């Protein structure tokens, strides 16, 4: 996105902070407007400590590390095998995790990593069944959006990075849409109060792992 260092850092920190603030209330129903989360909490499904991030940030860190190494080695940031090997290092060795072990992994991601661990012929091992359209690929998009040089590349990298672990067309589509919307938002000359056509009433927003629900909640 040709971002300066401060902007790129802000995007990545925003991912990690949102992850850490949201993880204690993961899978809960929407809260009343006067009961928003305004500071770090502990607890939740994974018994996180205050400020502790989860698999979403860990996988984004793993991807960012691979993008940097691929740029140095290959002259181009995206290398699916490098990314997947980093994902394996996180899953089985705890690298990139705040606890030095993997304590949170989705079923779709876990299946894709196990498949790649057994056969590294291709890095794109995400399940293509429509019921596997989880949000894992969408949640870790920041690194590829930072390195993309234009909107077309941002959309392409969003799809390819998602396809590593999530092959369902719906999961790929929402990553592409999100990449395009973020890119368009970042190149606007000033802040725009933008409401996406997919906006729904906040009481109807769900907080499960389905990619469409996550997209709607974020937007």
Located regions from the model:
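Structured, active/binding-site neighborhoods that engage oxygen-rich ligands
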Residues: 1-219
């Amino acid at each position: 996105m040709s971002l300066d260092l401060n902007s790129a850092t802000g995007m990545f920190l925003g991912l990690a902070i949102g992850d850490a603030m949201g993880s204690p209330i993961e899978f809960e129903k929407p809260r009343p407007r006067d009961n928003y989360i305004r500071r770090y909490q502990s607890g939740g499904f994974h018994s996180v400590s205050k400020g502790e991030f989860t698999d979403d940030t860990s996988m984004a860190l793993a991807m960012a590390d691979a993008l940097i190494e691929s740029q140095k080695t290959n002259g181009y940031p995206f290398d699916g095998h490098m990314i997947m090997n980093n994902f394996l290092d996180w899953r089985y060795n705890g690298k990139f995790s705040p606890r030095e072990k993997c304590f949170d992994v989705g079923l779709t991601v876990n299946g894709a990593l196990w498949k790649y661990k057994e056969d590294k012929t291709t890095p794109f091992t995400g399940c293509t069944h429509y019921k596997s359209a989880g949000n894992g690929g969408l949640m870790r998009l920041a690194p590829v959006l930072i390195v993309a040089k234009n909107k077309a590349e941002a959309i392409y990298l969003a799809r390819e990075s998602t396809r590593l672990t999530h092959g369902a067309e719906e999961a790929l589509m929402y990553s592409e849409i999100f990449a395009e919307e973020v890119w368009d938002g970042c190149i606007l000359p000033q802040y725009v109060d933008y409401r996406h056509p997919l906006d729904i009433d906040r009481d109807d927003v769900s907080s499960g792992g389905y990619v469409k629900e996550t997209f709607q909640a974020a937007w």
